[in-house]
Amino acid sequence: MYQSLAMAANHGPPPGAYEAGGPGAFMHGAGAASSPVYVPTPRVPSSVLGLSYLQGGGGAAASGASSGGGSGGAPSAAGPGAQQGSPGWSQAGADGAAYTPPPVSPRFSFPGTTGSLAAAAAAAAAREAAAYGGGGGAAGAGLAGREQYGRAGFAGSYSSPYPAYMADVGASWAAAAAASAGPFDSPVLHSLPGRANPAARHPNLDMFDDFSEGRECVNCGAMSTPLWRRDGTGHYLCNACGLYHKMNGINRPLIKPQRRLSASRRVGLSCANCQTTTTTLWRRNAEGEPVCNACGLYMKLHGVPRPLAMRKEGIQTRKRKPKNLNKSKTPAGPSGGESLPPASSASSNSSNVATSSSEEMRPIKTEPGLSSHYGHSSSMSQTFSVSAMSGHGPSIHPVLSALKLSPQGYTSSVSQSPQASSKQDPWNSLALADSHGDIITA
């Protein structure tokens, strides 16, 4: 925009084209080139410039023409350029964002002096500062505009020369702020455990209260269960009733079903072989037919069906011996067996001695004179000699019985000390013989 003004100032018509004034009626080329007022404000978008000058273009041109006419003595807005100045500014504002300067025309009207151009630039800067929030200069206007924009609320109203543009932006920002603030104000975050709102926490804590409060199954009345379930109406069910309802679709019956009949009394079953209905164990044959335990075992062991003649009305049980008796007898048996061999050996030895002695005594009794020929032991010879000398037959029998019983009487001593058995036997017989001899002789 300012470049077009500079070009118009440099390449404008010569003095006196439209006015009768001297060279001061129009701005000079050198002054226009060196004037600092033609520097545009920093980072001002063209759309804002177009919108800002859309309404004030004609007024600025009129004020510039009137000031120029007053200073230079030219009639105010009398030339045709003044009449065509407003269409030029309005065309520039109507273009919007893409601003294109109008073509340079010799009939375009400009202010007469450099001072009037400076006043026009100052007025434009003031309007821009007012639009951005009332800053002193170009940089101050930009900073103040940013601060004013940052401090403004999302739903606030803006007083600006372009209300349509900022109203749309403000409305969109307000809607975005409301949308972004919506999730944070929703009751979802208030129900988090970290919140201090007890009313919002209560619904979430109901799940944990189920474990602390006492529950009762509405179907069976159970007070404890591994897992609490709920039916379609929300009532509590124990794990068993809940699973039954889930699988079968009906409530679990409260009456417990009767126990399955024992195998011996199953209704409708009979042995395919013997036609019995009572057994301790039902089996199946090769064809899959039920058979009693007896027929099934017989077929399994012998490979042939059990004969009907072996059928019995009652169930025959096996007579088992008690295991305690076997355990009590087994430890006593070996001990008795171990103690028996020495006793048997001692008794056999003693019996052998007794038989030999009895055999020797028999010929002695018949032939007393031959007693000297059987001198096996002094005790025996003394005994036989005493008996022979006395000649009393009946008195000899107690001695013989004592002699026969003496080995048996000392079997216990022999079993206790078998080492001294050989030495004690002659001495025992001698002592008995002497004692009986004394009795006999007396």
UniProtKB/Swiss-Prot annotation:
Biased composition (Gly residues): 62-73
A Pfam family matched in the record: GATA
Subcellular location: Nucleus
GO molecular function, one term: co-SMAD binding
Keywords: Activator, DNA-binding, Metal-binding, Methylation, Nucleus, Repeat, Transcription, Transcription regulation, Zinc, Zinc-finger
Reported modifications of this chain: Methylation at Lys-300 attenuates transcriptional activity.
Gene Ontology biological-process entries: aortic valve morphogenesis; atrial septum secundum morphogenesis; cell fate commitment; endocardial cushion development; intestinal epithelial cell differentiation; male gonad development; negative regulation of transcription by RNA polymerase II; positive regulation of DNA-templated transcription
Cellular component annotations (GO), alphabetically ordered: nuclear body; nucleus; RNA polymerase II transcription regulator complex
Protein's recorded name: Transcription factor GATA-4
Species whose genome carries this gene: Canis lupus familiaris (Dog)
